[in-house]
């Protein structure tokens, strides 16, 4: 999980865009853009018309998510507001930790797909050059993925291997997309939402 940078460029920093140059890295990579206050007199005001991006997703758009970048701290009894994508990235890291606590079988790749697929679309429709997949939606991410998508799966299928604990896990989001599901391992995974993904579903022990 990398910070996009704070230079308001059309693309993110060099570390954030590494999978563009080394594609094998993408399965474990999330770039985090930040939204900060346009007006210094309205710092911490998260009304949409007061927010601006600190960077652009650019070449990293397929692995970018956006969240708020303002951070509050009290110094000598006074509230201070700091901003930067370095404050945005920990929000995504914390979200990944919460998802992993609920779904311990998830690999880093599945955590990435879950976080990106559940983002709220903002800016231009779809995955765009500024916000990537959109605004971090923690509540939705904690319900499992919302897309089985070839752009996220980096192939035709999403691969899930349950952890062998024979527990019952549940995905509560509706799941759409153009990829399929390959489910392995022991345990039970229930898809409670409406599943309209277009790929095949294959379930087996290996």
Where are these regions (language model features)?
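Extracellular S/T/G-rich loop segment that most often corresponds to the catalytic His/Ser-adjacent loop
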Residues: 18-97, 101, 105
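Extracellular repeat-rich scaffold modules on cell surfaces
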Residues: 78, 85, 90-91, 98-101, ...
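C-terminal subdomain of the subtilisin-like protease fold in secreted/lumenal serine endopeptidases
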Residues: 28-31, 42-43, 101-169, 173
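Outer-envelope exported proteins of Gram-negative bacteria
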Residues: 3, 112-116, 200
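Active-site environment of divalent metal-dependent phosphoester hydrolases
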Residues: 6-12
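Active-site neighborhood of phospho(di)ester-bond hydrolases with catalytic His/Asp-centered motifs
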Residues: 1-5, 32-33
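Residue-level detector of functionally special positions within alpha-helical transmembrane segments
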Residues: 5, 84-86, 132, 137
């Amino acid at each position: 999980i990398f910070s996009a940078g704070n230079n308001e460029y059309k693309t993110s920093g060099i570390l954030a865009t590494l999978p563009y140059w080394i594609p094998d890295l993408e399965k474990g990579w999330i770039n985090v853009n930040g939204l900060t206050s346009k007006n210094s007199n309205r710092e911490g005001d998260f009304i949409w018309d007061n927010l601006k991006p600190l960077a652009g997703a650019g070449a990293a758009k397929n692995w970018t998510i956006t969240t708020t970048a303002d951070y509050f701290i009290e110094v000598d009894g006074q509230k201070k507001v700091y901003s930067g994508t370095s404050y945005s990235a920990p929000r995504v890291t914390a979200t990944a930790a919460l998802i992993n606590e609920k779904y311990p079988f998830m690999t880093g790749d599945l955590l990435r797909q879950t976080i990106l697929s559940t983002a709220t679309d903002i800016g231009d429709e779809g995955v765009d050059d500024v916000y990537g997949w959109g605004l971090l939606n923690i509540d939705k991410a904690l319900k499992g993925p919302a897309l089985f998508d070839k752009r996220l799966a980096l192939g035709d299928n999403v691969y899930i291997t349950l952890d062998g604990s024979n527990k019952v896990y549940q995905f509560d989001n509706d799941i759409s997309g153009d990829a399929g599901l390959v489910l392995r391992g022991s345990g039970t995974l229930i898809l409670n939402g409406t599943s309209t993904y277009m790929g095949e579903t294959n379930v087996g022990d290996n």
